[in-house]
Amino acid sequence: MEANTLFLLKALCLLCFNVCFTLASDPDPIQDFCIPKPVTSPYHDHHFSTNLPCKNSSEVTTEDFVFSGLKTAGNFTETGFATVPVGPENFPGLNTLGISFVRADLKPGSINPPHYHPRATEVAHLVKGRVYSGFVDSNNKVYAKVMEEGEMMVYPKGLVHFQMNVGDVTATIVGGLNSQNPGIQKIPSVVFGSGINEELLMKAFGLSLKQIGTLKKRFDPVMSNEH
């Protein structure tokens, strides 16, 4: 009996080790911490690097490991959606630790459009409200439900996911990602705001040139600023 128990414990430890190794997204740190010198690149900028120069340890303070920016919502867009991304650029203590966060607030009826993080898995915790949340796997199967306060959902790395507030109050979600530079690509902007050939888009979606033009005006940052 003791031998079986010992075997199970060893197997469990090995499984945990393999899972942790497999899920690791960023390089392991080679020191206790590396508080970066001030930078300006946002956490979802693909140019953001873990190879940032570190402060001298004599300059590091407790405040480098404390972040208060999730207490309040970010600035709401016209569509009723607000985010507060949290990475090494505004929470220095996260640098080299392979993790980042985001607070998302959705007014009733508003959405976080389909998007994905190419370099990270995300775990979303619904702090307040009722939110229809889910993701789509590589077989185009949707896994979605209406989440209640206190529930969590995981969005596997690289899979498209989304949220919509189906409640009567502003919903708040806090997400954790296993990379300090997870990246983000919003599907509407990727398709219609990146400059893909219009003829290709017409054939892919069965839309007219006029319809494609309307969508590009909405999602292309250059064209939207001209109108």
Swiss-Prot record:
May play a role in plant defense. Probably has no oxalate oxidase activity even if the active site is conserved. It comes from the Eukaryota. Residues 68-213 form the Cupin type-1 domain. Belongs to the germin family. One of its GO terms (molecular function) is manganese ion binding. It is found in: Secreted, Extracellular space, Apoplast. Pfam families: Cupin_1. Glycans are attached at residues 56, 75. GO terms for cellular component: apoplast. Keywords: Apoplast, Disulfide bond, Glycoprotein, Manganese, Metal-binding, Secreted, Signal. Residues 1-24 form the signal peptide. Disulfide bonds join 34-54. Mn(2+) binds at residues 115, 117, 122, 161. Oligomer (believed to be a pentamer but probably hexamer). InterPro entries: Cupin_1, Germin, RmlC-like_jellyroll, RmlC_Cupin_sf. Gene3D superfamilies: Jelly Rolls. Its main location: secreted. This is Germin-like protein subfamily 3 member 2. It comes from Arabidopsis thaliana.
